[in-house]
Amino acid sequence: MKIIKLLAFAALCFPLVASAIDGVELLKKVDRNLEPESYESYRKLINIEPNGAKKEFVIYSVKKGRDQTASLFLSPSSDKGRSTLRQGDNMWLYIPNVGKPMRITSLQSVTGGVFNNADIMRLDYAVEYDVKSAEDKGDHFLLDLKAKTGEVAYDKLMMKVDKKLILPTEIEAYASSGMLMKTLRFKDIKDFGGGIKRPATIETDSPLYKDYKSVMLYSGLKKKDFPDEVFTQGFMSRLEELRK
């Protein structure tokens, strides 16, 4: 009789154990569903001012592994040829005919909009954040993410994850003071081929920049491998070669 009772108790408890959310694995899946570990992409960034005025940038980006990324500005003409490089927490901006690459920070913005450099040169979320908690909210999962170091642009992220697609739908980014810095919304699921199906649009706004808005539109994204040389300061002036 005791054995039967123990088996019955175990059967009741098993669904609770099985339903527990592994937040670390969930975040890793989010990273890989958003992008392959190594890839190339084409994006348009649009900054929208309160009066409706817009400024657009077209950017070619490449990434290798979890913490190396480089980007080349294709337009507007005033920015064409500029490039950025990120290795972990270190970032550089190269401007043609100005000299050697200059250091930049994650909270600055090479495009001058609501997206900062950390957004534009994003690494895997699992590289920069630990999972504090993961909750099942019925129609979505909610991940509470804490920055691993003080070098990360945001101290905390609250990420809503679509249960079926395991992709983010909304991220609130907070400073260490608890102040909301910005909200990012992921929209327009698109099949890019090669098994990549993700939001093609990311919109952001911030209480720090009232009535300003920035939009990131992905037009191309595919898995591609690159040599380590691509992710060095010496290659920043040669990124155009990757497109030939």
Residue ranges and their predicted role:
Residues 2-9:
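Sec-dependent signal peptide recognition
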Residues 13-17:
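N-terminal signal peptide c-region/cleavage motif recognized by signal peptidases
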Residues 20-38, 44-46, 53-55, 79-155, ...:
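Flexible, processing/modification-adjacent segments and terminal tails
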Residues 46-49, 189:
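Short, solvent-exposed loop/turn elements at beta->coil junctions and helix N-caps
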Residues 61-65, 87-88, 107-111, 187-190, ...:
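A short, sequence-level motif marking secondary-structure junctions
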Residues 70-79:
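N-terminal post-signal-peptidase region of extra-cytosolic proteins
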Residues 122, 138-233:
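Gly/Pro-enriched, hydrophobic low-complexity segments
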